Design a protein with these regions (language model features):
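Surface-exposed, interaction-prone regions used to assemble/regulate multi-protein complexes
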Residues: 1-130
Length: 130
């Protein structure tokens, strides 16, 4: 998914009550120096039923891989006992991990909104799910 590898993502929000993690690549505006059409929208990566997060706050381009085998030992119980999915997040040559029920990736043009605050919001398009 080339859209994820060419953008900067930030941990945008996390809610303990719903174990919901939002990672966002924020849209840019035409008056910004480095604007182009590929930045005309936010890209939100929403992880639900999150039980483990190992990420820096800023990621320069990402690749998300669901690990089905060769799972690091420290995550075996999450997978075997609880049925969670293990996601490896690759960014700038490093690997990070999120253990969660699933994820969804959506595009939107929300300015001061997100699905942490309003779960009824609908993305303009969904570009990935686990």
């Amino acid at each position: 998914m080339n859209e994820l590898t060419n953008r900067v993502f930030k941990i945008w929000a996390y809610t303990v009550s719903h174990n919901f993690l939002l990672i966002r690549s924020q849209m840019k505006f035409p008056d910004q120096e480095d604007w182009n059409r590929s930045y005309a929208y936010n890209i939100d990566i929403e992880f639900s039923a999150v039980v483990y997060v190992d990420l820096p706050t800023i990621l320069n381009g990402i690749v998300i891989i669901e690990l089905l085998d060769n799972i690091p030992e420290k995550f075996q119980d999450f997978k075997l006992k609880f049925g969670h999915k293990i996601f490896e997040i690759k960014s700038s040559g490093n690997s990070y991990y999120i253990v969660a029920g699933n994820y969804r990736i959506g595009k939107n043009t929300w300015l001061n909104k997100d699905r942490i605050i309003d779960m009824n919001l609908e993305h303009d398009s969904i570009i990935g799910v686990s």
